[in-house]
Amino acid sequence: MQETNEVVEKAKDFWAKFSNQVIYVGSAVIIVGGLWLAYSNFIQKPKEAKADDLLFPVEGLFDKMAQTGFSKDSVNIVLNGGNGIAGVLKIASTYSSTPAGNRAKYIAGACYLHTGDYANAVKELKDFSTKATQVQSAAYSMLGDAYAELNNNDDAFTYYKKSASVNDKDEFSASEGYFKAALFAQTTGKTSDAIELFQKVRDDYPNSAHARDIDKYLAQLGVLN
C-alpha cells in the first residue's frame, strides 16, 4: 500500500513539475493534427483535383504523340501550353506536391528527350518517382538514354540497370532492360559488366526472347560454352 502511495505521489509530483509542458505538447499535437486535416481537406485535395483537370488534356495529347510521333508543334504545346491547354512545365512547377505534378515531370522529361534537350530531360526525369514499377522502369530507361547522349556513360549504365532491376519480376520488361544494359556495356568497353548481364538474361530469364541468342553475344566477348 505504501508503494502504491509513493507511485501516486511521484505521479502527482511529475504533473506538478511538467503540467504546463504536457499541456503545451498535447495542445501542439492537437493543433498540428487539426491544421493537417484542414490543409488536406481544404487546400491539398482541391489542389490535386485542379492539377488533374489541367493535366488530363495534356496526357491525351502526349499519348497521341507517343503513338504517332513527337512533332515540334505538339511538343511545344505539351511543354509550354497553348490552344487552351496548360503546359506540363507550369503544372509541374505550380502543383509539384500533387500526383499530377509528378506525372507532368515524366511527360516533360520524355518530350525533352525526344527533342534532343538531354540536360533538361535528365532534370525532369530525376525529379519524377512512382511506385508503379513499369512506369518507373521507363523513366530510368529514358534517363539512361539521356545520359548516354550526354556521353556520361557511367550514369547511363547505372540507370539502364536500374530500369531492369526495379521491375525484375516482370520477365519481359526485366529481360529487355538487362539486355539493353548489357549491349550498352559491351559497346562502351565494360566487358565484365556486359558478360555478367548477358549471363543474367540467359540464366534468370530463360524463356525471354533474348535468352536464345545470348551465347552469340557472349562469344563476341570471348566467353564460349
Language-model segment annotations:
Residues 1-28:
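N-terminal positive-inside, membrane-proximal cytosolic segments immediately preceding the first
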Residues 45, 92-101, 129-137, 165-173, ...:
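Short solvent-exposed coil/turn linkers within tandem alpha-helical repeat scaffolds
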Residues 89-145:
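Structured, soluble extracytoplasmic/luminal domains of envelope-associated proteins
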